[in-house]
Amino acid sequence: MEVKVENIRAIDMLKARVKNRVARSKCFKNASLILIGITTLSIALNIYLIINYTIQKTSSESEHHTSSPPTESNKEASTISTDNPDINPNSQHPTQQSTENPTLNPAASVSPSETEPASTPDTTNRLSSVDRSTAQPSESRTKTKPTVHTRNNPSTASSTQSPPRATTKAIRRATTFRMSSTGKRPTTTSVQSDSSTTTQNHEETGSANPQASVSTMQN
């Protein structure tokens, strides 16, 4: 009977150990499950954070690209201009020219007055001689014009002399016509008076023309 009791106790001890192991195993299982869940959650969080980081990075890069090209082009242009200063010298030094111009303008305003020679009697005499030389041709021209008129005076005199001849001829013809029609001798008084008037007019015109020519020569 004692052997049976000992066997029963041994069996109970084995059962207790098995239960403990099972309990321990269950705890391990639960612990392992908890650990697995925690790891999965951490992995999910890590994945979420990585995705958000990539999205933010792409958006920031796109914004940077949209804003950066003008600045980069300006930088490139500035580097090109510094590398090649002979391309646009006026564009590179506008401020220098603007600052130098005020200093140059007073010098330019002062230089003409300083460089101009003072007027001397010699220069005034030269100017007066030049004015006289320029005035003499005009006077000579004015003098030559009356000579042309004096040359034309004989023609005018001839033209003035021609009408009296025509008038005397007409008067003679009229007298001959009267003689033939009346058969009487015409009175010569009218003819002589007409011819005398014409000759007087001719003398007056001839005397007036030389006086006009002399007055023009004197002028």
Curated annotation (Swiss-Prot):
Presence of the UniProt keyword Ubl conjugation in the record: no
Glycosylated position list: N52
Chain intervals with Polar residues compositional bias: 76-142, 149-164, 206-219
InterPro entries per the UniProt record, alphabetical: Metaviral_G_glycop (IPR018585)
Region (Disordered): 58-219
Compositional bias per record (Low complexity), positions renumbered to this chain: 165-178, 187-199
A single GO BP: symbiont-mediated suppression of host cytoplasmic pattern recognition receptor signaling pathway via inhibition of RIG-I activity
Positions in the Virion surface compartment: 52-219
Major localization listed first in the record, in broad terms: host cell
Assigned GO CC terms: host cell membrane; membrane; virion component
Membrane-protein topology: Single-pass type I membrane protein
Keywords from the UniProt entry: Glycoprotein, Host membrane, Host-virus interaction, Inhibition of host innate immune response by virus, Inhibition of host RIG-I by virus, Inhibition of host RLR pathway by virus, Membrane, Signal-anchor, Transmembrane, Transmembrane helix, Viral attachment to host cell, Viral immunoevasion, Virion, Virus entry into host cell
Residues passing through the membrane, by range: 31-51
Compartments, as annotated in UniProt: Host membrane; Virion
Intravirion side of membrane: 1-30
Quaternary organization: Homooligomer. Interacts (via N-terminus) with protein M. Interacts with protein F; this interaction occurs on the surface of infected cells. Interacts with protein SH. Interacts with host RIGI; this interaction inhibits host immune response.
Role this protein plays: Attaches the virion to the host cell membrane by interacting with glycosaminoglycans, initiating the infection. Unlike other paramyxovirus attachment proteins, lacks both neuraminidase and hemagglutinating activities. In addition to its role in attachment, glycoprotein G interacts with host RIGI and inhibits RIGI-mediated signaling pathway in order to prevent the establishment of the antiviral state.
Family of the protein in this entry: Belongs to the metapneumoviruses glycoprotein G family.
Listed name of the protein: Major surface glycoprotein G
